[in-house]
UniProtKB/Swiss-Prot annotation:
Main location: secreted
Cellular component terms per the entry's GO annotation: extracellular region
GO BP annotation list: angiogenesis; cell population proliferation; endothelial cell proliferation; positive regulation of cell division; positive regulation of MAPK cascade; positive regulation of vascular endothelial cell proliferation; regulation of angiogenesis; vascular endothelial cell proliferation
Name of encoding gene: Prok1
Organism, scientific name: Rattus norvegicus
Protein purpose: Potently contracts gastrointestinal (GI) smooth muscle. Induces proliferation, migration and fenestration (the formation of membrane discontinuities) in capillary endothelial cells derived from endocrine glands. Has little or no effect on a variety of other endothelial and non-endothelial cell types. Induces proliferation and differentiation, but not migration, of enteric neural crest cells. Directly influences neuroblastoma progression by promoting the proliferation and migration of neuroblastoma cells. Positively regulates PTGS2 expression and prostaglandin synthesis.
Disulphide connectivity of cysteines: 26-38, 32-50, 37-78, 60-86, 80-96
Protein name: Prokineticin-1
GO MF term (any one): growth factor activity
Similarity comment: Belongs to the AVIT (prokineticin) family.
Pfam families per UniProt: Prokineticin (PF06607)
Keyword Signal: yes
Coiled coil: none
UniProt entry keywords in alphabetical sequence: Angiogenesis, Disulfide bond, Growth factor, Mitogen, Secreted, Signal
Location in the cell: Secreted
Amino acid sequence: MRGAVQVFIMLLLATVSDCAVITGACERDVQCGAGTCCAISLWLRGLRLCTPLGREGEECHPGSHKIPFFRKRQHHTCPCSPSLLCSRFPDGRYRCSQDLKNVNF
């Protein structure tokens, strides 16, 4: 009987609530903290989230390097951290790296 009551309460809560609380949602970079940017979510279409700046080896977009960017960012990745640059690798992908001379291919 107790299990049936718990299931009933769970079903009631699921049908009553039709929204979710998402923390870190943003529209522009200025709404995010230091070391982050407002990037498009990979999972939820139309949602932008405060995302950490790219670390070494992470994918980046070569045209997305300005922080803060005052319009809506059009990429799912943030620019690289200040000490890194967005470099094209032999596989055709762009990644954050320290220096092209020191990259091991």
